[in-house]
Amino acid sequence: MTTVGENSPTTQITIRYPLSAIRCPLTSVLCFLSFFIFLAGCGYTTRSTLPKSIKTIHVEPFKNSINYIEGTGRNIYFPLLEVNVRNAVINRFLFDGNLKTAEPALADLVLKGELTNYNRAALRYTDNDDVQEYRVQITVSLVLSNTQTGETAWTEPAFTGEATYFVSGPTASTEDAAVVEATADLARRIVERTIEDW
C-alpha cells in the first residue's frame, strides 16, 4: 500500500495494487525458468559405458545371406540392402559421436554383420479382412571384436530393426519407405548395443 500526501495532512490517497499484478511477474519468471529447464532436458544423448581406451570402430561390409527362395514371410530382394544397412550404421556412429569410424588397422573395435532375414507381416486388418497395416523387419547377426585384446566383445545372432506402414488412408506409405525406416531403426539399435553394454 502506498500513501501519498496532499497539501493538508488529513488528505490521503491510497493506491491498492491488485494481487494479480503482484503474481504476474512471479508467474512470468517461473514460466521462463521452467522453459529453460525443459530445454535442458531435451538434449538426449546416449551415455557411453565404453572403456576410455576404446575410441574407434570399423564397420565391415555386411553380407547378405537372406534366403529369398525358402524364407518365411515375404522375402523380397531389395537391391543393395546390405550396403544401405552398413551405411546407416556408419552414419549413426558419426551422429552419436562416442566412437569414430576408422580403417581396420587403426580401429579399436571391428563390427561384422550379416543380413539373415527380411520379413513383411500383416499387422492390422480392415473390417473387410483387407490388410491395413504391415510390419517389416530386417534381422542381422552381429559380432563385435576388440582388436586390443583379440577377443569377441559380444555376439548377437538375431538383431532386428523394424518399421510399420499403412497401405491405405491419410498416412499411407510404401514398403520401400518402411524398409528405410527399419534400416534406420536397426542402425540405432546396433549403435546403442555397441556403446552401452560394457
Residue ranges and their predicted role:
Residues V59-F62, F93, G113, V140, ...:
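Buried hydrophobic packing residues in well-ordered domains
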Residues E175-W198:
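Compositionally biased, intrinsically disordered linkers/stalks adjacent to structured regions
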Residues M1-I22:
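N-terminal secretory signal peptides that target proteins for export/translocation
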Residues G73, Y77-V85, E103, Q132-V136, ...:
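Extracytoplasmic/periplasmic, Sec-exported soluble proteins
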Residues P18-L19, P25-L26, L33:
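Short polybasic linear motifs
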Residues D96-W154, G161-S173:
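Surface-exposed short loop/turn segments
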Residues S28-G41:
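Bacterial N-terminal signal peptides
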Residues G41-I90, N98, Q148, E192-W198:
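A structural "domain/chain start" motif
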